[in-house]
C-alpha cells in the first residue's frame, strides 16, 4: 500500500503564524495525499476551523499570537478529541505534554514519517 492510498482520506489543519511555513507544510501534506482543511495564523482562528472540520491531524506551532499552541491545544482537546496534535516548533526541545507528537521545525522532512505512525 502506498503512502498516497494510505493517507488519501486523512485531513490536517495547519496552524503557524509564518505564512511561508504554512505554505511549505501545505505542499508537503498535499504531496502525500493528505487533505488540508485549513490554515490558521493563530489559535483563535484555528479552534473554530477544527470544530467545524474535525481534522485527523493538527500541526500546531507553539509560539503564536493571541492564543499560543499550548492554549490552543487545551481547547482543541475538548472540541476535537480524536485529532492528533503535532507540536511543530523551533523553540521547544522536547515533546510538550499537550501534544501527541513533537517535531522541531528544522526537521520538517521527518513530518510525513511521523504522521504515518498515527495512520497505521
Cite the ranges covered by each PLM segment.
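Two-component/phosphorelay signaling modules centered on CheY-like receiver
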Residues: 19-38
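Active-site residues of response regulator receiver
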Residues: 16, 61
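Acidic catalytic/metal-coordinating carboxylates
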Residues: 42-45, 68-71
